[in-house]
Amino acid sequence: MGNGMNKVIDGLYLGNIRDSENRDSLSRNGITHILSVCNNAKPVLEDMTYLCINAADASSQNLSQHFKESIRFIHECRLNGGACLVHCLAGVSRSTTVVVAYLMTVTSYGWQECLTAVKAVRSFVGPNYGFQQQLQEFQMKQVSEYQAWLRASYRSSPFKDQEQVEALLSLFAEQQQQGQQNDPEWMSQGSRIYPLSYNQYSASGSNR
């Protein structure tokens, strides 16, 4: 499933920089909006609506500061009948972090469950250690606030996001049982969920 962009839920896709410039694939998947999260992110195609976030794939990069604008961009796109591709360079770390933050906001699932759901459709994803810390911090301190903000700012969601993520979790469990993802490549450093203590991110004292 690593070839090309992958559908996560209705109106939300995850991919790499090549996917963001592939007109055939963009058209085939009905993409109208592109959220670019990479070094020197900039609009490329004139007929797309962009949100460009300049961010490095480094543990010291503060990506959570961009969660709210990213969530707004994705949600408004979907509510207006569009489809959003979120991408970074490889479609593994930065873009996955943003997608997970969005899924956390539109469902009741935590960051690890949302990341697992994404792995059901794109098995090799894996936010770096710093981004996982930021997702944990988001879950601990901000996600309920963002959920309330989303409910207050927009009409009732017509989407079945909770059910779709639940279905992805079931799919991932089935994949595990079938042994489809028990190869060493999938368990590589890039796709690993790191063991984080509950207050690990806060204890680091970082102002990323």
From Swiss-Prot:
Annotated keywords: Cytoplasm, Hydrolase, Nucleus, Protein phosphatase
Please name the top-level EC class of this enzyme: hydrolase
Q: Catalyses which reaction?
A: O-phospho-L-tyrosyl-[protein] + H2O = L-tyrosyl-[protein] + phosphate; O-phospho-L-seryl-[protein] + H2O = L-seryl-[protein] + phosphate; O-phospho-L-threonyl-[protein] + H2O = L-threonyl-[protein] + phosphate
Q: Where is the active site?
A: 88
What's the main place this protein lives? Answer: cytoplasm
Give residue ranges for domain Tyrosine-protein phosphatase.
4-144
GO cellular component terms given for this protein: cytosol; nucleus
Q: Which GO terms describe its molecular function?
A: protein serine/threonine phosphatase activity; protein tyrosine phosphatase activity
User: Mind telling me which InterPro entries this protein's record contains?
Assistant: Dual-sp_phosphatase_cat-dom, Prot-tyrosine_phosphatase-like, Tyr_Pase_AS, Tyr_Pase_dom, TYR_PHOSPHATASE_DUAL_dom
In the record, biological process GO terms are:
signal transduction
Known EC number(s)? Answer: 3.1.3.16, 3.1.3.48
Subcellular locations according to the entry: Cytoplasm; Nucleus
The family annotation for this protein states: Belongs to the protein-tyrosine phosphatase family. Non-receptor class dual specificity subfamily.
Please describe what this protein does: Activates the Jnk signaling pathway. Dephosphorylates and deactivates p38 and stress-activated protein kinase/c-Jun N-terminal kinase (SAPK/JNK).
Instruction: Please give the PANTHER family that the UniProt record associates with this protein.
Output: DUAL SPECIFICITY PROTEIN PHOSPHATASE DDB_G0269404-RELATED, TYROSINE-PROTEIN PHOSPHATASE DOMAIN-CONTAINING PROTEIN
Protein name as it appears in the record? Dual specificity protein phosphatase 22-A
What organism is recorded for this protein? Danio rerio (Zebrafish)
* Encoding gene (name): dusp22a
